[in-house]
Amino acid sequence: MSNLDKERAYGGGRPVPGYSLDVNGRKVCDGQIEEYIMELIEGEAFGYGYYKIYKLLRRKHHLIINPKKVYRLCKKLNILKPQRQIKVKYPRRIARNREITASNQLWEVDVKYGYISGEDRFFYLLSYLDVFDRNIIDYHIGLYCSGQDAVFTLGNALKRRNINNPKETGLIIRSDNGPQFISHVFEEYCNTVGIEHERIPVNTPNKNAHIEAFHRILEDDCLSISEFETYAEAYTAIVEYMYYYNNVRIHSSIEYLPLMEYYLGVLAG
């Protein structure tokens, strides 16, 4: 077992995220709904109040949701119309095409949701992926995922890669517009340590293609074939899969080698 896995410890219960159904009866985690809301705010709904956002959620994402819940989620995200900031302290940087030639130049980060059928609730998996060597550098599993969790996990990822001065190495973090990544605490941390944080435009998941591909593999290899009874069971399964993904599974994009073997080979020259 790697050091990454030895350091994991089951953290017990945390606040439970809820969900809403869509018109097909599929359960949509509140975290995903929050992402939908933030994408709307970044686009056509910038000047809308919560009731128009509620209407868009029903029309665009086919959610069965009531206005009170949309109000509550908007209030939690600090984006009710009176709460919205006119001037952003950390201006948004739009993701652009880059030529990546080495590890630790560009990391992608995103959140994936998993369902625990035995407890009828969702858990969160936040992961940082190196675009060059494709390793999952570090990750967070929890029943909740905040901007502070994203910061803590990023700090651990920097330590794992022995990056003491991100500004000197020119590290770029690329994310979508999820609430964790537009939070003040995340933007402030990136600014303080010298990381350039860029965000993909709304409805362009191809700009975060590598971590989206990882999420599809995770879904196919693990989540879609598992029915978790407890959070502890889901937690253990994800930790085991992450070890497998980095250290055992071969990848066609890197000469059919395991990711960690490829990364260590690059380090050795």
Question: PLM ranges: what are they?
Answer:
Residues 2-106, 204, 260-264:
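Basic, flexible linker segments flanking DNA-binding modules
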Residues 105, 135, 147, 151-158, ...:
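Retroviral integrase
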Residues 105-137, 145:
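An active-site-proximal beta-strand-loop segment
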Residues 121, 139-164:
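Active-site beta-loop-alpha junctions of metal-dependent nucleic acid enzymes
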Residues 165-182, 205, 257-260:
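Acidic/histidine-rich, metal-coordinating catalytic segments
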Residues 191-195, 216-269:
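C-terminal domain-tail junction helix/linker
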